[in-house]
């Protein structure tokens, strides 16, 4: 038994005629007849009764047809899936990201990315940067977005260097400034990132000598921005998180450069993935365009 014989059987069952089946398969009628005869010999079943110019499927043929049709539906599904994979519309994509991105830019971009990819299975994990690196290293994530040093063994890394911005409540005295200096923060309550993070250390180096009111310490950028929105204080923040709040707070450049960029992390081990390549390329384009539109990146 071979696939061509099964295809001939399916064509005859679909059309009900040898001639029509031959046209469907783009072969001659004698060729179809030979394939059906060989298929009957291979299965040791009489599949059709010949009555003049007509052929009538036997009960055995009808029973076999159910399985053959189911198999061809499966083959068609495989073909469609292969086509989807070829145009990056199917497969799996596992993303681990620090909360500043997992709660903001990434969901916005991801909704756009999957719109024309209905068969793409995606997982998005919001994790601390250290755990993002672990997820990529262990193979639990295909891509990671994290804060941290750029020199890391065993990873492929791409990054953007972005200046942190100052987030102030609407109507605040600093909202009228073109640029905020460390001295402008004197007497203000600063909402700062969790002590010990790389970004928090960078901020403290920049404003450490300024007299301020007691600070509020938070673990998430979005928490800091929500507090700014409610008038609780001022935050020096990464623009990737702040972009989600531009209609509710005021963002101003800071006079001292504080690197608020992030890393795109992929494992250096293993074969590249077309869908991952497409995602990362399109995400950086989306990110850069959005930052430029809002004056947060040159």
Curated annotation (Swiss-Prot):
Occurrences of domain HTH lysR-type (ranges): 1-58
CDD domains reported in the protein's UniProt record: PBP2_OccR (cd08457)
Keyword Transferase among record annotations: no
Gene3D superfamilies: Periplasmic binding protein-like II (3.40.190.10), Winged helix-like DNA-binding domain superfamily/Winged helix DNA-binding domain (1.10.10.10)
UniProt DNA-binding region: 18-37
GO molecular function, one term: sequence-specific DNA binding
InterPro entries in UniProt: LysR_subst-bd (IPR005119), OccR_PBP2 (IPR037415), Tscrpt_reg_HTH_LysR (IPR000847), WH-like_DNA-bd_sf (IPR036388), WH_DNA-bd_sf (IPR036390)
Family per similarity comment: Belongs to the LysR transcriptional regulatory family.
Listed name of the protein: Octopine catabolism/uptake operon regulatory protein OccR
Source species of the chain: Rhizobium radiobacter (Agrobacterium tumefaciens)
């Amino acid at each position: 038994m071979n696939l061509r014989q099964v295809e001939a059987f399916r064509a005859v069952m679909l059309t009900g005629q040898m001639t029509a089946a031959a046209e469907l398969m783009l072969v001659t009628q004698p060729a179809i007849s030979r394939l059906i005869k060989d298929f009957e010999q291979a299965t040791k079943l009489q599949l059709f009764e010949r009555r003049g110019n007509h052929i009538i499927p036997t009960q055995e043929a009808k029973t076999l047809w159910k399985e053959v049709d189911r198999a061809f539906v499966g083959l068609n599904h495989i073909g469609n899936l292969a086509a989807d994979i070829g145009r990056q519309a199917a497969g799996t994509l596992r993303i681990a990201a620090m909360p500043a991105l997992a709660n903001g830019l990434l969901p916005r971009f991801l909704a756009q990315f999957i719109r024309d990819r209905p068969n793409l299975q995606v997982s998005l994990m919001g994790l601390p940067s250290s755990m993002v690196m672990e997820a990529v290293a262990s193979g639990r994530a295909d891509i990671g977005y994290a804060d941290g040093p750029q020199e890391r063994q065993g990873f492929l890394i791409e990054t953007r260097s972005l200046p942190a911005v100052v987030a102030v409540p609407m109507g605040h005295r600093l909202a009228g400034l073109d640029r905020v200096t460390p001295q402008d923060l004197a007497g203000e309550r600063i909402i700062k990132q969790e002590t010990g993070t790389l970004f928090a250390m960078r901020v403290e180096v920049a404003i450490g000598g300024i007299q301020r009111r007691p600070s509020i310490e938070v673990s998430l950028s979005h928490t800091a921005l929500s507090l700014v929105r409610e008038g609780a204080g001022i935050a020096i923040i990464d623009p990737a998180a702040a972009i989600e709040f531009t209609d509710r707070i005021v963002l101003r450049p800071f006079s001292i450069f504080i690197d608020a960029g992030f890393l795109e992390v992929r494992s250096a081990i293993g074969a590249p993935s077309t869908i991952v390549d497409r995602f990362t390329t399109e995400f950086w384009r989306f990110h850069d365009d959005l930052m430029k539109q809002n004056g947060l990146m040159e």
